Every structure is written in C-alpha cells, then in structure tokens.
Design a protein with these regions (language model features):
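Short coil/turn linker and secondary-structure boundary residues
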Residues: 43, 91, 114, 136, ...
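Acidic/histidine-rich, surface-exposed loop or edge segments in extracytoplasmic proteins
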Residues: 26-34, 56-61, 104, 124-126, ...
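Charged, long alpha-helical assembly modules
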Residues: 154-229
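Solvent-exposed, polar/charged alpha-helical surfaces in well-ordered, non-transmembrane soluble domains
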Residues: 46, 50, 77, 81, ...
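Soluble oligomerization/assembly scaffold segments of membrane-associated complexes
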Residues: 53, 58-154
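N-terminal, leucine/charged-rich tether regions that mediate assembly and partner docking
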Residues: 1-63, 85
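Conserved phosphate/pyrophosphate-binding and hydrolysis machinery centered on Walker-type P-loop NTPases
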Residues: 38, 69-72, 208
C-alpha cells in the first residue's frame, strides 16, 4: 500500500496495516461500476468509482468495509488487484499510480472545498474534457479544470489546482475510452447532467484534426466556386 500511496498521502493516514476489506463481483455487461462503503472515513463511494474507472474497471460491484472507522486508502489498490486477477486483465503500474493519485487528489479537493459530491463531479467533468480533447499540456489541462469548476460553482485554491493538473497529466496518458468512462461512472455523470452540465457536446477533435477540417472546408469552397462558373 505504501508503495502506491506513499508519494501522495501522509503515512499516518495510510496506517501501518491494511485493515479494509474489499469484495469485487463482476456484473452484467453495461451495468457500470458501483461502489458501496462501510466504516470508511477518508474516501467516498464516488471517489473510488472515479479512480477505479480510470484504472479500467468495468461492470463490477465493489464493497469496501472496515472493522471500525478507517481511511480506506488501501482498498483502491486491493480492488484493482482483485479485478485484475478476476478478469485476467493486467493493470499497468502507471495506470495504478494515476488512479491512486486521482483518489487522493479528490479526497484533498473535497476537504479544500468542503463538499465531497462537488469534488467528485469536478474530477469527473475535468477528466472527461482532458481525455476527450486529448489534452496533455499543463496550461490546457488547467483551463479544463478551471472551466469545470466554474460550471459547478466551485472555488478551488490555486495550490489544489496545481495538484489536480499534475494528476490529470498522468490520467491523460492512461488508455481510457471516453464513452466507457461515462457509462461505467454513470451515477456521477448523471449528477453532472442534472446540474446542467452536458458533456455530450464536448468538442473531441484534436488540434490537428481541426486544422485539417479548416483546410478541407476551404478546398471545398474553392471547388464549389469554380464549379459554378
């Protein structure tokens, strides 16, 4: 656990022993990822869901429990490894690192803004923009985070924004299908939709494609002009 979490969270929060228990059950195709928790104080169900979907989990019921109130940070690592063994799908070290970073960053964000639901929704909205628009540069990712925060009416401290940008740069390198992302974390994205944030209209074209379309449109206009002579 310390191997994956040590860079992102104090050892006092991680604890000396992994006390959480994780159960992962594969469910029918299209059902999405659903997480329930009991006696977990640091991470919410939505935080786990966001991070697990980033790690590539699909169609699974995940139950995280503690013998008493515990942080539950080790549960993410346990859930990813259990899913990998159960399905035979390998989860790379980089992907596990990105998902772990995401979980901790979301928990820290929730503490900073005082609202776990808003923190979960901000991460989900910004992540969708980063992945669908293939954003990799810090300034572009920062704009995606800030625009998502504005849409949700959240004021995020600058130091937290910087941490989120660093985390999202890692997420941007993970091979995640955007449509699958929204389906697997459907509960969170439905909340965004209810809040009036429609991510279905996000422009997913990269800069190269936009430039190509621009010149294609010019060429088409020239052809139409000469065809009319």
């Amino acid at each position: 656990e310390h191997e994956y979490l040590g860079d992102y969270i104090a050892s006092s929060v991680i604890g000396k022993r992994a006390l959480s228990s994780v159960m992962v059950v594969k469910t029918e195709k299209g059902s999405g990822v659903h997480v329930t928790t009991d006696n977990i104080s640091y991470c919410t169900s939505g935080m786990y869901t966001n991070a697990l979907v980033t790690a590539g989990l699909e169609d699974a019921e995940v139950k995280v429990t503690g013998p008493f109130k515990i942080s539950g940070t080790s549960a993410l690592v346990g859930a990813m490894k259990a899913y990998s063994v159960m399905t035979g799908k390998e989860i790379s070290e980089d992907t596990m690192d990105a998902a772990t970073n995401e979980l901790v960053a979301t928990a820290n964000l929730a503490e900073a803004v005082g609202d776990s639901d808003k923190a979960e929704q901000l991460i989900a909205a910004a992540k969708e923009k980063v992945l669908s628009q293939r954003l990799t540069k810090r300034e572009d990712i920062k704009k995606a985070i800030e625009s998502s925060a504005k849409e949700l009416g959240i004021e995020v401290p600058e130091d937290e924004v910087d941490k989120l940008v660093t985390m999202m740069q890692k997420v941007s390198k993970v091979d995640v299908n955007v449509d699958a992302l929204k389906k697997q974390a459907g509960e969170i994205y439905n909340k965004l939709k209810d809040a009036g944030i429609d991510l279905s209209n996000v422009d997913t074209k990269g800069l190269a494609q936009k430039i190509g379309d621009f010149f294609a449109n010019i060429f088409e206009a020239i052809v139409r002009f000469f065809s009319g002579l």
